[in-house]
Amino acid sequence: MSKVQVKKVVVAYSGGLDTSVIIPWLKENYDCEVVAFVADVGQGDEELKGVEAKALSSGASECYIVDLKEEFVKEYIYPTLKTGAYYEGKYLLGTSMARPVIAKAQVEIARKVGADALAHGCTGKGNDQVRFEGAFAALAPDLHVIAPWREWDLRSREACLDYLAERNIPCAASLTKIYSRDANAWHVSTEGGVLESTWNAPNEDCWVWTVDPEQAPNEAEYVTLQVAHGEVVAVDGEAMTPYNALLYLNQKGAKHGVGRIDIVENRLVGMKSRGCYETPGGTIIMEALRAVEQLVLDKTSFEFREELGIKASHLVYDGRWFTPLRQAVFAAADELAKDVNGEVVIKLYKGQAVATQKRSANSLYSEDFATFGADEVYDHSHAGGFIRLYSLSSRIRALSQNKQ
């Protein structure tokens, strides 16, 4: 198939080996100008150190580094948290939530520089190619999309390193890379290496942020979270931005080994993959939000929020962020979160984050009605009529079966 003709491409650039190869490869194979776009989603200063110089030395004409940290947490993480989304019951969607904010910013840079194409470094095996290209389709259907991993014949790190060496392009990457990692403000994921066999227990070097829970402090630590409309607005009495609150809780949780999971998940493309994910601050925040929900949501609202969480987890994981259904699901969750206001104390100890105290001005919990002692506000005799009506369909079914 003949290649499309493009003049200027904006590539999502990380500074790693793959994207360092993509820049000269695009120039050689498409005879185009390449602009590097770097998204700062909280992956850390070390990851961003010297990234602009790397991009330019690889052949990029320009390099844009865009700070997306606050937008990522405020506009992508919290709306997802309000749904209660856990993919397949465990995964807090750290990589999945980051892709749409990155793709959106990449499109904005493309518009700014007058590019006619977008490129990414996602492999043909993973979920991210779908997430990026799904976002591009929704936000910039007029732009061409180039996925080098689906076109080139470079199939190993050695081949990529040789490619750069032949062109005298400097690269600090090593020949051996044990793990594949992805980090942002919300989490860090580790895949590959020893984890490729499900019979291998994770090595300690599979974990990056968190201490081994067995080696965590022997004394519990408590953090107090103030929640307003389903979002953390203060921690330990200090008002914080969404990103700063997450950063603070990441540090607290990591110290106590909170937020580790080792899972095998179903990828969108059909295969299963295994990963070790660390989400210390996010685990604390989710525990706090669910604790307040227990106080303020009535039974049917809580059931509906759980249904929203399951649907949202698949929409986000599957790269359907910029769709009407995702917007509708999140709008419903946002409506339920209006009364999710309160204060929660979370105990951090040996890998666990547990809500030990909670209160809310919107609480539906009444000590007068909930007491197990003598009370004067609840007439127990009223329960009989309710139960008879509640079980009426079962009674009718049984009587009908007895007649047959």
From Swiss-Prot:
**One Pfam family from the record:** Arginosuc_syn_C
- Name the Gene Ontology molecular function terms of this record: argininosuccinate synthase activity; ATP binding
- Could you say which residues bind L-citrulline here? 91, 96, 127, 131, 180, 189, 265, 277
Q: Its pathway?
A: Amino-acid biosynthesis; L-arginine biosynthesis; L-arginine from L-ornithine and carbamoyl phosphate: step 2/3
GO BP of this protein = argininosuccinate metabolic process; L-arginine biosynthetic process; urea cycle
Known InterPro entries for this protein? Arginosuc_syn_C, Arginosuc_syn_N, Arginosuc_synth, Arginosuc_synth_CS, Arginosuc_synth_type_1_subfam, AS_cat/multimer_dom_body, Rossmann-like_a/b/a_fold
Positions bound to ATP: 12-20, 39, 121
Subcellular location per the Swiss-Prot or TrEMBL entry: Cytoplasm
Q: Which UniProt keywords apply?
A: Amino-acid biosynthesis, Arginine biosynthesis, ATP-binding, Cytoplasm, Ligase, Nucleotide-binding
Q: Does the keyword Ligase apply?
A: yes
Question: What positions does the entry give for L-aspartate binding?
Answer: 123, 127-128
Query: EC number(s) per UniProt?
Result: 6.3.4.5
Q: What class of enzyme is it?
A: ligase
Catalytic activity of the protein: L-citrulline + L-aspartate + ATP = 2-(N(omega)-L-arginino)succinate + AMP + diphosphate + H(+)
Q: How does it assemble?
A: Homotetramer.
Family assignment?
Belongs to the argininosuccinate synthase family. Type 1 subfamily.
User: Any idea what this protein is called?
Assistant: Argininosuccinate synthase
Q: What is the lineage of its organism?
A: Bacteria, Pseudomonadati, Pseudomonadota, Gammaproteobacteria, Vibrionales
Name of the coding gene: argG
